[in-house]
Amino acid sequence: MSIPLPDVALTELSATRAPLDWVGMDGIDVPILLDEPEFAYPVHARAEVQVDLPDPAIKGIHMSRLYRLLDGFAGRDRLNPASLAVLLREMVFSHADCNSTRARLTLAFSLLCRRPALLTQGLSGWKSYPVRLEAVWEAGRLSLDATLQIGYSSTCPCSAALTRQLIEQAFVERFSAAGQVEPAAVAAWLQRNATLATPHSQRSVAEVRVRIPEGATRLGLLALIERIETCLGTPVQTAVKRADEQAFARLNGQNLMYVEDAARKIRQAVAEGFSQFSVSVRHVESLHPHDAVASSSS
């Protein structure tokens, strides 16, 4: 004879009665299939999933229901705004006996993108872009935010100007009494002395959060990444040979930027495609033991 298993979430009342904004699970490992043409392979994601518990008389939610819905989604559907809306709506329906009205899903993963070298044909490497998706179903509507981290290089304009001044002073000191100077002599001097001072530069990180527009059929993550990298002009490279490293040095010289410049460039680029967004940039200074930061939002 089968003996019924107890379910205290249904049969007992909470000793302390209060509504809860969110209840659920954090750190669930799942494979996710992105509905993006550039990503045919599954990505490993860490998921957070919750529903609200507005009724203070109900002791707890049914976490296994949320887990099974998420697990079925991960192995079945491609992730896009429409499929997320269906999943979250099902999570709310699964907790009708808890009087839940809202559901929330957060997915954290990294996009691996193949990036070609700047000049060398056939040379490329993998670059990782951390992504965080936050989807909420409330009042019959989906709100979906995407946060991306993008690495780039920044060279300080002030440091570049100070460097140029030192090189200029050294050049004048060497050739001021020489009268007419042959180009070959100038070239030889520059070969030896053009790096008697160098501007400081550093690896930098932009974190961009956007609200995916209602009616969007896809997330458009790679398009957003490329828009940001293009506006900055100095994306961090993967595999390089000397010609590529030289081209990267040229890009840094052509795109000198303070942290303020980077934040404004990104803001302008993101605002062309999204009405709700925030931008945060961090330059991990090589001159200082602290970072330079700037942020902006819509």
From Swiss-Prot:
Superkingdom of the source species: Bacteria
EC number(s) stated in the UniProt entry for this protein: 3.5.4.16
Matches recorded under InterPro entries: GTP_cyclohydrolase_FolE2, GTP_cyclohydrolase_FolE2/MptA
Site note May be catalytically important, residues: 156
Known pathway: Cofactor biosynthesis; 7,8-dihydroneopterin triphosphate biosynthesis; 7,8-dihydroneopterin triphosphate from GTP: step 1/1
Any single Pfam family the record assigns to this protein: GCHY-1
UniProt catalytic activity: GTP + H2O = 7,8-dihydroneopterin 3'-triphosphate + formate + H(+)
Gene Ontology BP terms: tetrahydrofolate biosynthetic process
GO terms for MF: GTP cyclohydrolase I activity
Keywords: Hydrolase
Function: Converts GTP to 7,8-dihydroneopterin triphosphate.
PANTHER family the record matches: GTP CYCLOHYDROLASE MPTA
Family to which the UniProt record says this protein belongs: Belongs to the GTP cyclohydrolase IV family.
Designated name of the protein: GTP cyclohydrolase FolE2
Source organism of the structure: Azotobacter vinelandii (strain DJ / ATCC BAA-1303)
